[in-house]
């Protein structure tokens, strides 16, 4: 077993999953892959099973219904902790997140003894490819909104390319996570930051998918806007502890 696990939530990613799996398995660092399939209707789950049968590094969890990104990651985190992985990644399956950046995340986590490494689209400038101006403005506005309400100092608190250390995930009550969907990106980062864990950022380039369809929707956007207030109310005026 490799010490690093990549969690790939999938819903209808048949075009991307085989290519992503091949790319991840070719990385020199050596990683295991967990596909958490949300009851895909296009055969993605079956493709994942076929890949797992050929490659011992690939594993699959099947959800009986589309429970949302948040529930998929919680299932993946629990699976990873039960099996002793040291570094656990969140990552999109559609190549929006470049697999070649994984060694950079690992190096940053080890060299800086970080508990959570965030891939930032906005560290030192804007690093987004093939987004229309409207979407870029909405994204930047959301980042500012989250930072103001939560107090988090990070340039990209809503990003979805992350590397957690085992000790950080162990410190969170995963059953108490509120998020069902994309707002888990905000909630997990906020909980670790509030608990005093060391969170750092590394710059990444985010490239809009070329295969399949985006899962972003108005409901997802609204959930994230509401989540920051739930986190604020939950924490009140409690002071954040010093970094561990």
Q: What are these model-derived regions, one by one?
A:
Residues 61-82, 87, 99-182, 209-224:
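Acceptor/aglycone-binding surface of glycosyltransferases and processive sugar-polymer synthases
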Residues 3-5, 32, 187:
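Cell-envelope/extracellular polymer assembly enzymes that use nucleotide-activated donors
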Residues 12-26:
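Short, well-formed alpha-helical segments that are part of the catalytic scaffolds
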Residues 13-16, 40, 98:
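Donor nucleotide-sugar binding loop of glycosyltransferases
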